[in-house]
Amino acid sequence: MKTLLLTLVVVTIVCLDLGYTLTCLNCPEMFCGKFQTCRDGEKICFKKLQQRRPFSLRYIRGCAATCPGTKPRDMVECCSTDRCNR
């Protein structure tokens, strides 16, 4: 009986989806050191560079469910591994 119980526990642990959470940089600066753990469904890290006016750039980094869209003069890079949006 103990063997059966132990076997069931081992099978449950092996089959259990422990859930992987992605970690992405999340800050508006060019050089960033703040990280966030992405929520369920967010499997993409992104880095967006917006050109507001000549010589004025804005950086946006974070997690997303899909790669964000762009406007003219924007640049977006998307990736799917931890801290890949440097």
Swiss-Prot record:
Tissue: Expressed by the venom gland.
Keyword Protein biosynthesis: no
A GO CC term attached to the entry: extracellular region
Signal peptide as annotated in the record: 1-21
Disulphide bond pairs: C24-C45, C27-C32, C38-C63, C67-C78, C79-C84
Pfam families to which the protein is assigned, alphabetical: Toxin_cobra-type
Classification via CDD domains: TFP_snake_toxin
Residue stretches in coiled coil: none
Molecular function terms from GO: acetylcholine receptor inhibitor activity; ion channel regulator activity; toxin activity
Keyword hit for Iron: no
Superkingdom to which the source organism belongs: Eukaryota
Sorted UniProt keywords: Acetylcholine receptor inhibiting toxin, Disulfide bond, Ion channel impairing toxin, Neurotoxin, Postsynaptic neurotoxin, Secreted, Signal, Toxin
Places the protein is found: Secreted
Family of this protein: Belongs to the three-finger toxin family. Ancestral subfamily. Orphan group II sub-subfamily.
Function text: Binds with low affinity to muscular (alpha-1-beta-1-delta-epsilon/CHRNA1-CHRNB1-CHRND-CHRNE) and very low affinity to neuronal (alpha-7/CHRNA7) nicotinic acetylcholine receptor (nAChR).
Protein name (record): Weak neurotoxin 6
Gene source species: Naja sputatrix (Malayan spitting cobra)
Organism phylogeny: Eukaryota, Metazoa, Chordata, Craniata, Vertebrata
